[in-house]
Amino acid sequence: MKMKIIFLILILIFSINIIKCDKEFKMLTLLTAQVDDLGFNNMINQGRIEVAKGMNIEDSRLLVVEGFNETFKHLLPIVQNDDIDLVICSSSGHLQACRAIAEMYINSTTIKTQFLVRGSSSPTRNLIYISYNYASANYISGYFAALFSKTGKIGFVSPGQAANNNDSFVYAFWVGARQVNPDIKFYYYNIGNYLDVDKTVAATNDLLDMGCDVVGNTLDDFSTGDASIARGFPAIGTNGFPQRHVYGENVIYSYSYNWTKFFLPIAESVKSGNTNNSQWYADFDFDENKNFYHLDYGFEVNQSILDKMNTEIDYLKSTDRMSHPYYCNELIPQYAKENNLKLANVTGITLPIGCVTHQTFLSINKPFPGMTYLGNYKIKLVEVEFSQSLQYGFSITTGVLIAITIIMMLGIVRYKSTPSIRSASPIFLNFILAGGIIVYIGIIVWVGPANDHQCNARLWLVTLGFSTLIGSLVVKNFRIWLIFDNPELKSISITNYQLFPWVGACLVINIILMSILTSVGDLREIDAQGIDSLGKYEFMKVCKMNSSGASTLYTILAYFAALLLVGVFVSWKIRIVDIQEFNESKAIANTLYAISFCLFVIVPLMISPQDKQSETIVLCTAGLFITTAALLIIFTPKFWRVFTLGDGGTNDMFRKKQSNVATARAESSKSSSGPKLNRRGNLVSDDFTDTETSISEKKVNVVAGAVLAEFTDDTISEFDDNNIEQDNDNDNDNNNNNNNNNNNNNNNNNNNNNNNNNNNNNNNNNNNNNNNNNTNTSQPNDEKVEEKQQNDTEEEDKNQ
């Protein structure tokens, strides 16, 4: 009884050890991409899953790595720490790293990891090799492509040498097609990678455009098939995945790998502790348990094609691999001679004339006669241009505004003698308009195609235009301030020639700053990618400068801001001027305020990343708004007064006739003589009081002419000679009247002191009344004129 119990315990322990052993087997599979590529990596993963199912492996891992450095870096710690039993290095890109780690632990007693790698070298105690005849799969695929093609043109997309893959498999595809049709037209591209969707799709589309109706590939994914289906062409699956399971009848042919048939026996051998490793080989085989490839056809493939395909596959199965057509054909000898390749000479095997070994086959890279190599494919970058409609819109709008501005300049010349134009200085008005035209031209250049010259020209034009426009506005404001902010009413002469240097100084500062920007800013056109939601292979020509140029640009903006602040201050100082022809402060201030407001929008836009096309739209719109608003605000009132008032102004000082008061004084004061001076010794008329606190609107024309001359150029602002003579006569009459009144007052003073005091008081009262009348020159009314005439008459009666 005891023996039975012991026996049962031993059986239980043995069973537990077996179960424990099964659970502890660990397998790691290396991939070059994710399993959703519907290609090579997906099929490797399918083999891993089937092995885990068949052997009840709980710890079956995946690791996506590529290349020696990445593979070695991530794999070594796992091997050292996780007690992995089997590492499947699925890609040739994993080969070197896996071999290096296997070499490190080949004699280790603690790390017993086995490595399954791609290749056909001699195995070791911890290194297992597996290879599959990829050439036969490509050969039979090319055979099918030539059978199915209706145009006699087929294409191919290959990784090429850039991916450490020669074009021997491209050659195998072409050999299969040539077996069917010796005159087949064959075109192929290299894309430099096993997995590059963008290049694959673009290269496939190019091949389809050339007339190829069947396109194969040796890539890891199905991008070639996707591109063909999208264009309405049938696709073939040549990357080892059963594409028809996904795409149905859009795929007319595909072959798939069955890695389970090889991974499973290898894993079982490793689990059993076998270290006497061997080399494994996968290909077409009559033994279904060893047949690596499975072919699937669409309904469009007729029976004749199927029969030919089956016949050719049976030929490959029954023939020694070294005698297959891609190893042996009549083109090999000449090709080997031209490219220094050795012909096959295998001991114990009788080969046809003109064969190469598998190693020599793998070194085939240059195309054979009949193969058209299109080169390493480079995706053509597509330029995204600035919207043509917006270009036309801005250009046409700006052109119309330029035409209107030119008409305004002609209007300035035509109506230069009218008070509204004459009082504002026609020369400066044309400067302002010229600045506007320069800005408009800069905007047209701004929306045009970008190049180095355009990048520099647009900034030069816009900044010079604004300097001319704003500088002229500020200088005009400054002159108005100096003349009207004159409490002593001294005669101040500020000619245009005195103001030109100030406008020139504004331009010189602008030119210096722009010269610095041009010289050190490296302002040039570049092909920019990754902006404005552009596609991966789209670009836009944009202007770019370095940090020095950006700093200079900010300095230019600061200069404009300072100029605007000066203009705003001066326009505020002259807000009290009541004569409309001279009072441009409101118009200029409104212009400067509009510009300042726009700068608050422009400056943040210039210093923050924005959509380039939107940035151009905002900047050009702001430029048009600023310039057009400035010109309309300044010139619309002037031309309106020209067309409504003609040669007359809004103030009587512009009318070349005397007021009623001046006429009455001229008639009653002819006996007076001598000039009349105020307390400061300045020449004044009877309409000015001794306090000199205001300018009378109802003045004699000599004063009006004198004030006007301070604002305008002598050649265009003086009255004609006849009017000047008339004004001088009126002045003389007024002076005579004043002298006569003074003489009469003196006589009255000598006769009676009391009367004299009364008269003086009356005269003072009258003078005060006159002063009160004169202080309201900008708003004359009939009641004040009549009251002033009555006071003048009473004064003359008393003096008599």
From Swiss-Prot:
Residues 414-426, 485-499, 573-586, 638-800 are cytoplasmic. GO terms for molecular function: G protein-coupled receptor activity. It is a multi-pass membrane protein. GO terms for biological process: G protein-coupled receptor signaling pathway; response to folic acid. It comes from the Eukaryota. Gene3D superfamilies: 3.40.50.2300. In the N-terminal section; belongs to the BMP lipoprotein family. This is Metabotropic glutamate receptor-like protein C.
